[in-house]
């Protein structure tokens, strides 16, 4: 049986049972929405749940693609049966039309979305007194100027493991793009 890093962490810390809402290849809009939705569907869990969030790439943009069908299989690549709807994602680097549009700044949009998602969940967890830990599961190479600095500075780093940019991630991106 597949066990996510979050489930393994829960097992090590004796925080079982663990619940995995992740779905491979999805983005951060889905993380925020499904996390909040799960708590609103299970309000008794506000008082006894520790949450571990591994943030996806800022360039994976999610959308709802339809209802959950009975025949879908649960798991990292399958449907998550806890919800009546399912998500899909598109990746900005795979969409030529958006990268050619001079009115769209993909990197700034991705960074604003990323920080907004992080802050939304941090505020949600704090409001409901839910203990949590966040980390970068994928690239964290984000824009670092203008009004973005205000959003970046608002992130609570006490609950975010290794928040600052990762040179290792940057080197891998350079190598991949070479």
Region locations from a protein language model:
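Serine-esterase "nucleophile elbow" of acetyl-processing enzymes
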Residues: 1-30
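Residue- and microsegment-level detector for short, conserved "hotspots"
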Residues: 33
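Alpha-helical cap/lid subdomain in secreted, periplasmic
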Residues: 36-178
């Amino acid at each position: 049986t597949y066990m996510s890093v979050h489930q393994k962490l829960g097992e090590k810390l004796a925080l079982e049972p663990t619940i995995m809402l992740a779905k491979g290849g999805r983005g951060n809009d889905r993380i925020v929405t499904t996390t909040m939705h799960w708590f609103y569907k299970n309000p008794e869990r506000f008082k006894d749940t520790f949450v571990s969030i591994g943030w996806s790439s800022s360039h994976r943009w999610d959308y709802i693609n339809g209802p959950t069908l009975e025949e879908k299989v649960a798991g990292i690549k399958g449907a998550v049966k806890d919800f009546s709807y399912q998500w899909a994602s598109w990746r900005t680097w795979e969409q030529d039309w958006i990268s050619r549009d001079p009115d769209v700044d993909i990197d700034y949009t991705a960074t604003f979305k990323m920080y907004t998602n992080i802050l939304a969940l941090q505020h949600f967890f704090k409001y409901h007194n839910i203990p949590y830990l966040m980390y970068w599961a994928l690239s964290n190479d984000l824009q670092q100027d203008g009004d973005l600095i205000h959003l970046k500075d608002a992130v609570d780093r006490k609950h975010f493991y290794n928040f600052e940019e990762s040179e290792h991630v940057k080197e891998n991106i350079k190598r991949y793009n070479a």
